[in-house]
Swiss-Prot record:
Coiled coil (UniProt feature): none
Membrane topology of this protein: Multi-pass membrane protein
Top-level taxonomy: Bacteria, Bacillati, Actinomycetota, Actinomycetes, Mycobacteriales
Localization of this protein: Cell membrane
Keyword Membrane: yes
Keywords, ordered alphabetically: Cell membrane, Membrane, Transmembrane, Transmembrane helix
Chief location of this protein within or outside the cell: membrane
Oligomer status and interactors: Has been detected in a cytochrome bc1-aa3 supercomplex; its deletion however leaves complex activity unaffected.
Name of the protein in question: Uncharacterized membrane protein Cgl2017/cg2211
Amino acid sequence: MAGSSHTIEPEIYRGVSTLDEPSAAWGWHGLKRNTIQLAGWISVLFMLGYNFGNHKGHVETIWLLVITALLVIGLLIHLFEPKLSQVRTITSRNKPVGHVEPDWTYDQATLTGTWGNLTDSQLRSVNIEPSRVAHLRAADSAKELDN
């Protein structure tokens, strides 16, 4: 037991880390799209083939047809793969050319930018005691008087 370690060593399989997805080594990551489609359509044929048998009622037939229909819908979605999340992405991350992101940490520390306009209650809501930053506010008001 002296040499045992409880840390998980990451392993990379086909560009996927086992820390991100533990099944990367043995899961479905290695299958290509065509393999999945072929296996799926063969499964559809088997499901339809199960309708010809010795069952008496229609309950089994209904279940087989519904599950087969769901499998077909899933295969068609997988085949055409709509990019729904990309179409619906809000463009808030898209910035205009030349945009420079403010240094929010510096602005908070020096009470400049949007942080300079906060009231005492707003400062307290983000755990900043107004009395501790009064000297920064005095410096800002002195600059405004000079202008």
